[in-house]
Amino acid sequence: MGRAEASGRFPWLAAVDWEAVSSVFPVRLPRGYLGDAHTPGDPRLLTALPANAELEADVGDIPDPVGEQARSPLPWVVRKHEDRVLLLLTKRCHVYCRFCFRRDHQPGEGEDPSDVEWGAMLDYARASGAKEVILSGGDPLAVTDARLFAAIDGVRPEVPVIRVHTRAPITFPSRITAKLVEGLRARAPVWVFVHVNHPAELTAEVDAALARLVDAGVPVVNQSVLLRSVNDDAATLAALSHALVERRVFPYYLHHPDAVPGNAAFRVPLAEGRRIYASLRRMVSGLALPTYVMDPPDGSGKFAIPVDASG
């Protein structure tokens, strides 16, 4: 969906300085993801549509909020843990989520690794001694099947476990084709980590995409982000967790929002997040309870946020 179509469908976008916002962070709006959303408060629109607030500096802004720059031994590679290596296959996404923690910085120049960089990152992963490689981006499913499978095959057999961190089943569910699913199944163990923030994102098309993966034996887990005005209440998070478990998707992490420049409107104070999580814990079973985590700017890696009965 282009700017003209989006502005016609969502009249409040007329007040948005589209050029300025998109020059800082791209805008991409698939019709399928937006679905029938039409009100400013719809969670899909809040997280996908550009807003002038993205241009406003905030005292809490941290350009690299999870400390990836200092933990990047090569372009397109992040190494925070001895047993894991993260490879960024691309900077492209099907939707550019306005709260994204990598919106201000990603290791690597351009939209995709060069051939030389691609070879170097796979060589690094193979020699790393890691037990898991995380394929991320951008969105790793914004690359072709051939490119994705080349990344998986390129680190095997040295690295046994592959994780594909993607929003494609949610934002572009037609990407989850029979060919892709069979390729992932044949390369097991491959875990798919999806990113659902609100029950409204679980459309019939998304359900079908998730089912294709799970039915083929590809394990699927979810990571959400606690977002102001989107899911910052326990009832919404509980509904999401229950819906995920019904779809055989494990609610793995609830991330405290990272303070990257441009996403201040989505941030939730930590004390409030703790209170919300304490309430959530009373509303769902252990199976449906994600771990509430924070990824600090020192690059040491995420940790579980301690929460007592009152928050």
Model segments located where?
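Flexible, acidic/Gly-rich N-terminal and inter-domain linker regions that tether
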Residues: M1-K80
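C-terminal accessory regions of radical SAM enzymes
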Residues: A20, R275-G311
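N-terminal pre-triad scaffold of radical SAM enzymes
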Residues: P26, P73-R102
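Conserved, mostly hydrophobic/aromatic
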Residues: Y33, C93, C97, V164, ...
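Conserved beta-strand segments that form the floor/walls of ligand-binding pockets within enzyme
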Residues: L88, I134, R163
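Conserved alpha-helical substructure of the radical SAM core
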Residues: R103-I134
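Surface-exposed cleft-lining segments at the edges of enzyme active sites
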Residues: P107-G108, G137-G138, V164
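Conserved AdoMet/S-adenosylmethionine-binding subsite of the radical SAM
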Residues: G119-A130, L141-V284
